Amino acid sequence: MKIENVEYKVIEDKRVVVASIRGISFDAINVFNNRFLAHATSHLDLVSAWDDQKFMMPYSMKAVARCIPDDEFSVEKGKQIALKKLSEKYNRSLDRHLMHIANAMKKCLDNMDVYFTKHKMI
């Protein structure tokens, strides 16, 4: 997640800070393509290989930091808390979607192994 893409909304009368990020639908696919496929292949692209929604992250996410009545409201502290919550939420989603991709790749490789074995190519 790029921190510079995070937007904040401060609602002082409710003592709330909301951190949000948009345009992250392809982040898991991009991480997979750039981190793993770029080293193994020249131009294999996951998006063109599979059109599956389970690989797509949500378009946007948000996290809310609420100040309890006993504490003093601080916009900066609220931003830190909201960003931490958003980062954790984003990373859980990224990990889950990368696992979907890894499982699909494993199935594909298993199918290739069966094919190669059947045709005595191995």
Task: Kindly give the residue locations of the regions a language model identified.
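Catalytic phosphate/metal-binding cores of nucleic-acid and nucleotide-processing enzymes, i.e., regions
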Residues: 1-122
